[in-house]
Amino acid sequence: MKIYQKVLLFIATIFTLGTVSKEVHANEFNFSVNPVLPENQIGESGYFNLQMSPGQSQTLTITLKNTTDKTVVVEEEIASATTNINGVVEYSPNKIKTDSTLKYNLVDYASIPKEVSLLPNSSQQVKVSVTMPKENFNGVIAGGITFKEKDSEKTNSNSKGLSIQNKYAYVVALLMQQNKNTVAPDLKLNSVEPSQVNYRNVINANLQNPKAGYLNQMYVQAEVKGLSNSKLSYKANKEMLQMAPNSNFDYPVSIGDGNKLEAGKYRLSMTVYGQKNNDGKFTYVDSKGKEQKFDYQWKFTKDFTILGKTASKLNSKDVTVKKTPWYENWLIWLGLLLILLALFFLFFILWKRRKKEEEEQDLEKEKLKAQLEEMREQISREDNSDEIDV
């Protein structure tokens, strides 16, 4: 299969904890990585792009060199290729879930030692065992091999006292295929739902590449319009995206900093172009006003609903949305008023009941008093009658 992707020999990846990024330089590494390309390598490239027969097993070699005067321990890990939220293919381990269409995960067909110790100023060859699935298939199994110095986190501090930990790693792409047959690309829209990116409200459109081939040079036009409120409209256009084989990612449509999500019905309209070709039949005008030709085009329309409780929850977590003080929230005041009214009616009912009980008690006392008075009069009459008889 023809791969249109240009993969660097080494993808120096920086994982930054915080909001400050830093360019990776060669001197950040205490070791170097050099893949030894085998005879069944496809094309002239600095990464593994192998053509293998069904069921074939093979051992690959990668040379690691320690360029320091101390022992360096290198951690090694294999991962399947995924697509991140920026529309960039990831070859290193991450938290992105594998797609439901991924039949052949590179992790199941390649293995490498977990770590290797490099003596000072020495080189060592690392062996990678790979096996092609026995079944015949068209397409590519894609992923990467990550090399990272153990305990290599470096902490930098800025003038405000913010500590930032940087992790540096070499990533060598590893592609395996049985033939060079072209796999026609496809694209699907799965779901559309509100979410957040970096604590900011967005509407995510999940795009899926269900084929075992790269989807290259993607240009995306997306617009979300309010159906319940026609004044609401959000757009997000991006260019030169790429998707890994059998992967999906959330394409975010920002609603803008400071804007609250509104509950209601919405409609997403999206057009995606793929694979540039001067003879392509689909035309797109890019951000510079230049016409671009593409071989493929996909159009999607999907209606969705944002619930009130979902909007409230996301708005409360959006760091750019101004929070309404509690004393300005009419719902809180209404709630307090209802509570006061409920308490008033409760006290009123209890007071009426107590008053009624007291009146009944007074009436009983009056009746008892009258009965006692009547008994006294009767006794008095009987006494007088006895005196007369005598």
Where are these regions (language model features)?
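Sec-dependent N-terminal signal peptides of Gram-positive bacterial secreted proteins and lipoproteins
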Residues: 2-26, 332-351
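N-terminal edge beta-strand
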Residues: 29-57, 194
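Short, solvent-exposed loop/turn segments enriched in Ser/Thr/Gly
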Residues: 54-61, 123-126, 138-144, 199-203
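Short solvent-exposed strand-capping/beta-turn motif centered on an Asx-Ser/Thr pair
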Residues: 65-70, 81-83, 135, 208-214
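Terminal connector regions
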Residues: 72-94, 131-179, 260-317
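Intrinsically disordered, low-complexity Pro/Gly/Ser/Thr-rich segments with frequent PxxP/GP/PP motifs
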Residues: 97-136, 227-261
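Membrane-proximal extracellular "stem/stalk" segments
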Residues: 180-188, 192-329
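Cytoplasmic C-terminal tails of single-pass
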Residues: 355-390
